[in-house]
């Protein structure tokens, strides 16, 4: 039986009543959404995500999407006989891999997301950080337990973001969909972790919310319990004891920095849940883990 058919009229009314204060509160604000994980690969979740994004726009919130594409990149690398390598959660990116990353993110994933949102009545426009050179990047050197300043190829970090292109799209009533590729000072492309781009973009847009969609319920402790609120100090401890590692490291670092630099609320949420965005934004309980800025109490 379809989910919508088993919700009573009374439950629907309660859900709408609970959402109303949040709609009023967040109308006119920007929400930057890092889109990745299962929500990008499972057809039902992809469609649900697109509908949710359109609904956010309809109630006056300005969603800005920054997407990943790890599974799709891995699949293409496998087709050409290359194996993906990662260091501290970052993809090692030689010239051939960079060409594939840019082709997959800009040529396939971005267009698919744009098309899906537009199918459900939105006005999405896809952009890459190389368009108008609006995401300036510099080479990222990674520290590992064994060695500092490891060069992992054409992997960058955000040097600066010119938000004019994105703000212009928002003002035109569009939903920007951003592929996380930056441009270096010589015009070269850099693969940038989508979490880092989402965090920096949220800061520069003075976003009300930064929402990062993942394949887990949120940040978990060693016993598997969900941590609903985390301070930077607690996060430092979780990294030190090995609870947080790999792909969670750039996600957490980006969330902490965004919270410290004016983004009013940063959340790591479970993208496997239907309507995850709506559950976080429009319900009293919310879902996932909220990252607090320095000086805030959990």
From Swiss-Prot:
The keyword Methyltransferase belongs to this UniProt entry's keyword annotation: no
Localization per record: Cytoplasm
GO cellular component: cytoplasm
Pathway assigned in UniProt: Amino-acid biosynthesis; L-arginine biosynthesis; N(2)-acetyl-L-ornithine from L-glutamate: step 2/4
InterPro entries: AceGlu_kinase-like_sf (IPR036393), AcgluKinase_fam (IPR004662), ArgB (IPR037528), Asp/Glu/Uridylate_kinase (IPR001048), Glu/AcGlu_kinase (IPR001057), NAGK-C (IPR041727)
Binding site residues for substrate: 69-70, 91, 191
Coiled-coil annotated residue ranges, if any: none
Gene Ontology molecular function: acetylglutamate kinase activity; ATP binding
Repeat recorded as keyword: no
Pfam family of the protein (one): AA_kinase
Catalytic activity field: N-acetyl-L-glutamate + ATP = N-acetyl-L-glutamyl 5-phosphate + ADP
Membership in a protein family: Belongs to the acetylglutamate kinase family. ArgB subfamily.
HAMAP family per record: ArgB (MF_00082)
Name of the molecule in the record: Acetylglutamate kinase
Gene name as annotated: argB
């Amino acid at each position: 039986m379809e989910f919508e058919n088993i919700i009573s009229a009374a439950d629907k009314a309660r859900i709408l009543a609970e959402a109303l204060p949040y709609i009023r509160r967040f109308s006119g604000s920007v929400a930057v959404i890092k889109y990745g994980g299962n929500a990008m690969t499972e057809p039902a979740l992809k469609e649900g995500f697109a509908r949710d994004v359109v609904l956010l726009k309809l109630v006056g919130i300005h969603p800005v999407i920054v997407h990943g594409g790890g599974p799709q990149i891995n699949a293409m690398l496998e087709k050409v006989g290359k194996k993906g390598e990662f260091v501290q959660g970052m993809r090692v990116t030689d010239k051939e891999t960079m060409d594939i990353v840019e082709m997959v993110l800009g040529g396939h994933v971005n267009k698919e997301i744009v098309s899906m949102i537009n199918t459900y009545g939105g006005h999405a426009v896809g952009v890459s950080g190389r368009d108008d050179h609006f995401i300036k990047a510099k080479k990222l050197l990674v520290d590992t337990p064994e060695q500092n300043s490891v060069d992992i190829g054409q992997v960058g970090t955000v040097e600066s973001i010119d938000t004019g292109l994105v703000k212009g799209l928002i003002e035109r009533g569009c939903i920007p969909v951003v592929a996380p590729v930056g441009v270096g000072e010589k015009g070269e492309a850099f693969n940038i972790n989508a979490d880092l781009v989402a965090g920096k973009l949220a800061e520069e847009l003075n976003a009300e919310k930064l929402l990062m969609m993942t394949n887990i319920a949120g940040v978990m402790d060693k016993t598997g319990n969900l941590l609903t609120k985390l301070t930077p100090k607690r996060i430092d401890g979780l990294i030190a004891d090995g609870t947080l590692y790999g792909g969670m490291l750039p996600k957490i670092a980006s969330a902490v920095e965004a919270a410290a630099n004016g983004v009013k609320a940063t959340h790591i949420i479970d993208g496997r849940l239907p309507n995850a965005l709506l559950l976080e934004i429009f319900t009293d309980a919310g879902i996932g883990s909220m990252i607090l800025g320095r000086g805030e109490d959990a």
